Amino acid sequence: MNRDRHTIVALIGSALLAAALSACGGSGGGGSEETKASLDGAGSSLVDPMVQAWKPELRDRSGIDLSYSPIGSGGGIQAITTRTVDFGASDAPLTPDQADACKGCVLVPWALSATGVSYNLPGAGDDLKLTGPVIADIFLGKITNWSDSRITQLNPGKDLPSQAISPVYRSDGSGDTYAFTSYLTEVSPAWKENVGAGTTVNVPAGTGSKGNSGVAGTITRTEGAVGYISVAYAVQNKLRVASIQNAAAEFVPPDLPGIAAAAEAMGTPKPDNSIPIVDPPASAKGAYPISTFTYAIVPKDSPKADELRALLTYAIGPGQEFAEQFVFAKLPAEVVELNKKTIASIG
């Protein structure tokens, strides 16, 4: 992730510190206005850094005290379905059965980021190159050593060690798992036939860890590890991230230009507002192939419709100013317009 790694590390460190200070000191500096309302949300850990940064501004602008628990996309879908929270968040759209169970929920694509493939391999440097089929075979248990010729051929000039590969995957229901497995399903017939795509799948090889923070910790502690993780968490934890070959045969890191290029190639949103952008076509030059929208999931008939409209209007508008600090690309204009119509339908 060479093009802007050092800049992003500095930005994300400062932004996370500011978010943490505001969360710990809710009544400090500018907190004279009383909170008028509250919203509780849960779900995607990918979007959590953005949501935490939104809290103080939403409180100042709208008097809304926002609480959010990054329990994973699967947990967020379940929580909003049972109405134990006011909104859910997921990097995966609802399946037809989930949409039926959620009873009148709508999707609002409110953030745009990527799932990275991080590794802990001393001597490999910051610019390891991988292809989708190679990644699939690692997690299928077919490639088990970093010195395998299929990896070394992609990285000429690197002296990759004879080190066992330790794959790491999400053990909880995860939108990162959905993005990662959706990509592998597109590029690997063996993965499509044997595993498929979903927020929870049976990964043939490796160790499961809970949440992005759990995956980051396991990779950090395990020499030879490789795992998929929200790029914001990879940067926060100073993990190396591979460049992945896209459909245009370019090796692209999960940085802001690569994410934005993937979004530019998006097709027409589906009727449920979902916008798949994994494995964009070869015409999408410079696109990172595991980019993803992440969605707020909101009941149209919520008793807190006013507060939800305020949150979502802020998130797709002024809240996008935080995007680059957390390795999110800003929402395309056409997605913002789609969201405005959806937000107006709430309540």
Describe the function of each predicted region.
Residues 2-6, 24-347:
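Flexible loop/hinge segments at secondary-structure junctions
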Residues 6-16:
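Sec-dependent N-terminal signal peptides
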Residues 19-23:
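C-terminal motif of bacterial Sec signal peptides marking the signal peptidase cleavage site
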